[in-house]
A protein has these predicted regions:
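Pyridoxal 5′-phosphate
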Residues: 1-249
Length: 249
């Protein structure tokens, strides 16, 4: 379709936990000369990310997803595309020359970094990226992957045993992230009870209201397991969830 100017796709769904075939999507888009932006907020945590092998035009993610400070993030983009893009914000250090007749902009990446940077937060990005990479390499990476597979199998089966529980996103190719609803239990009520038991979950639209509309719901409970979580913690979660459900019914 000639009206399509850019394709934006999640590497991994933040609601369903499903891993999208981004490389194939990129290949199809590039056949039509359409650039592709990949949202890597979940991908940077759970997947091996090689932007050159993926051949994406842009890859973005929040720093706090890999345990850096809040208010930080990464935007990777092809140089030729970034050079063609105008600055979206004005401020110090993003200009080269300024006159009444003409303004020229600084070289990349400065033209997109107007004003005083969040340098304290930025200092946390490098060690966070190194840590995220370490969690995916060698024996550590193998152990993390094996534990994630155990958690996925256990959680999928355990949630299926809860009466009235609907799990959204059950494809094999997924990460240990589980969004669900339980009949007779409002998501925010479950979240408050779980919080009292030391369990943190997310509820609401997850910034994906059209997807909620697709499933015919207004909210979900989301349990997201990270590389440092264990099968024992998944078992504790289910124990607490069953307790919360019994309190609400």
């Amino acid at each position: 379709d000639s009206r399509v100017k850019i394709v934006a796709v999640e590497h991994i769904s933040n609601v369903l936990g499903l891993i999208n075939p981004v490389k194939e999507i990129i290949q199809q888009a590039h056949k039509l000369n359409i650039p592709v932006l990949v949202d890597g907020a979940q991908g940077i945590v759970h997947a091996d990310v090689d932007v050159q092998e993926m051949d994406c035009d842009f890859y973005v993610f929040s720093g706090h997803k890999i345990y850096a400070a809040t208010g930080t993030g990464i935007l990777y983009g092809r140089r030729e595309l970034l050079e063609a893009m105008p600055p979206y914000m004005g401020g110090g250090d993003m200009v080269d020359t300024v006159s009444f007749a003409k303004t020229t902009y600084a070289e990349l990446p400065l033209k997109f970094e107007a004003g005083t940077p969040h340098f304290i937060g930025q200092a946390t990005l490098k060690p966070a990226l190194e840590f995220a990479k370490w969690l995916k390499e060698g024996e550590i990476g193998k152990a993390v992957k094996e534990e994630e597979e155990k958690i996925i199998e256990y959680m999928t089966n355990a949630l299926a045993q809860i009466e009235g529980c609907t799990l959204y996103g059950t494809a094999e190719n997924k990460i240990p992230l589980f969004s669900f609803n339980i009949e007779g239990c409002f998501p925010s009520d479950l979240a408050q009870l779980l919080d009292k038991m030391g369990v943190a979950v997310r509820t609401g639209f997850m910034c994906c209201e059209p997807l909620m509309t697709r499933f015919g719901v207004t909210s979900m409970v989301r349990a997201s397991f990270l590389p440092y979580n264990t099968l024992q913690e998944a078992e504790y979660f289910i124990k607490c969830l069953n307790r919360a459900v019994n309190m609400l019914r």
